[in-house]
Amino acid sequence: MTNIRKSHPLMKIINNAFIDLPAPSNISSWWNFGSLLGICLILQILTGLFLAMHYTSDTTTAFSSVTHICRDVNYGWLIRYLHANGASMFFICLFIHVGRGLYYGSYMFLETWNIGVILLFTVMATAFMGYVLPWGQMSFWGATVITNLLSAIPYIGTDLVEWIWGGFSVDKATLTRFFAFHFILPFVITALAAVHLLFLHETGSNNPTGISSDMDKIPFHPYYTIKDILGALFMMLILLILVLFSPDLLGDPDNYTPANPLNTPPHIKPEWYFLFAYAIVRSIPNKLGGVLAVVASILILILMPMLHTSKQRSMMFRPLSQCLFWMLVADLITLTWIGGQPVEHPFIIIGQLASILYFLIILVLMPITSIIENNLLKW
């Protein structure tokens, strides 16, 4: 008699994805972040569901409903801060996951990579709309500034912005629809993640060497289930330290002031995980140029397979490309820092140079360096 986990229609899917899945024997801890993202997503959906039970998406009561959650609901403060800081953990895992894909050439799995880029966009949209919901000063002005960027689109821009707002400014209609979208999008993300996994399992995982590992596979369970649990425990430890000791570390103090359309905060800035994009937007004096640059900064990921000129897939044995990769990481950290600074000298010029360097490394330096490495290895 065959095992039920191999014969039952539903169990069979789970078995083939998480138990008997043939996995490369040499994948490192950088491969943990896919499962960590799954855990983050489940955590966000669960905490978000409980927050939605007590939240009201009306401009007059939204701010006080969040205060009510923190003060009056049993463990409401814990749920709220797990959700807020869970988003930060989500983005840390996302950035590392994408970085791993760039470093080890995982973008050569075209379908998996492209679905991943769509997922990145969707998660960013969801996080942005979630930041608007507490209806503090930074929520309101962040929503106003970021949605206003769409008015740079020629001809339809202004109409598009007013259509998104549901009026002539960010108001009740905007808050209600953002809540609706913020609630539904995580389920869209879950569906996309399932497709992402489906395409990945068509090809099998990449590994640090970038060489086919078909002749050396091991079952996912118990080897990688235990490894993923260890990663999850580490992540939960960091998250709990953040939530229980300094829950407001990554937030903005301005968001503890109720939204006031008549009073603009001195420095409008988004959450830390959008600061790199915000720095790119601000580094171009032209509004449309800034919008195009920031969209390009993420859409550029789709071009990665076309920009791959090396004969090797992974950067593991390519020291020159490794230097460029870490330059890119340092550049993104610089952009994140600049995004949180006021628009004044010397931050403006640093932001402009960092933005130019970002595109230069990806579009010019990396492909050229790969060709040089090919020639050095006489390939």
Curated annotation (Swiss-Prot):
Gene3D superfamilies: Cytochrome Bc1 Complex, Chain C (1.20.810.10). GO terms for biological process: mitochondrial electron transport, ubiquinol to cytochrome c. GO terms for molecular function: metal ion binding; ubiquinol-cytochrome-c reductase activity. Heme b b566 binds at H97, H196. The chain crosses the membrane at residues 33-53, 77-98, 113-133, 178-198, 226-246, 288-308, 320-340, 347-367. CDD domains: cytochrome_b_C, Cytochrome_b_N. Its cofactor is heme b. It holds the Pfam family Cytochrome_B. It comes from the Eukaryota. The keyword Heme applies. It is found in: Mitochondrion inner membrane. Binds 2 heme b groups non-covalently. It is a multi-pass membrane protein. The cytochrome bc1 complex contains 11 subunits: 3 respiratory subunits (MT-CYB, CYC1 and UQCRFS1), 2 core proteins (UQCRC1 and UQCRC2) and 6 low-molecular weight proteins (UQCRH/QCR6, UQCRB/QCR7, UQCRQ/QCR8, UQCR10/QCR9, UQCR11/QCR10 and a cleavage product of UQCRFS1). This cytochrome bc1 complex then forms a dimer. Belongs to the cytochrome b family. PANTHER family: CYTOCHROME B (PTHR19271:SF16). Heme 1 (or BL or b562) is low-potential and absorbs at about 562 nm, and heme 2 (or BH or b566) is high-potential and absorbs at about 566 nm. This is Cytochrome b. It comes from Sus barbatus (Bearded pig). The gene is MT-CYB.
